[in-house]
Amino acid sequence: MAKYNPLSELVRRVISHGGFVNSHAHFDRAYTITPKMMNKTHDHLFEKWEYVDNFKRNAAVGDYFENIKSAIDTQMFLNTRAACTFVDIDPVCEYNAITAAKIAQEHFGDEFPLVIACQTLKGVLEKKPRQL
């Protein structure tokens, strides 16, 4: 008699109901980590933001789009059917990430439904982030 495998049962049920949905992604940050950053995984969030900000300061809309597109391609390869991605809007990246996410949303259309949620990473208590 085969041993019961709850993971296999879960996957079977999810697929029978239309497949997986990634409901909390950060596709604008996909593929931005480097091996050098891996030893910083236990650092305080504010320290990690410095590394993230370095990418964001230098990333154009096209850079964000390529990362988002690659992440979605990977999700589709894994049979994920749709996703919600949280995208930064702040004084560092301004509208670059959200613009790229909207382009990706249009690019994939119904092939991969993408919900975009805005994330004001630097907070809304200061005037500049709030205005964005």
Where are these regions (language model features)?
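Active-site gating loops and adjacent loop-to-helix segments of metal-dependent hydrolytic enzymes
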Residues: A30-Y64
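Mixed-charge, polar/low-complexity N-terminal
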Residues: A2, P6-S8, E50, G62, ...
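Di-metal (Zn2+ and/or Mg2+/Mn2+) metal-binding site signature of metallo-dependent hydrolases
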Residues: R13-K36
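Histidine-rich, glycine-flanked metal-binding segment
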Residues: M1-H17, A117
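Active-site loop-helix segments enriched in His/Asp/Glu that coordinate
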Residues: M37, F55-L132
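Single, functionally critical "micro-switch" positions that shape active/binding sites
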Residues: V21-A25, Y51-F55, L78
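Histidine (H) residue identity feature
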Residues: H17, H24-H26, H42-H44, H107-D110
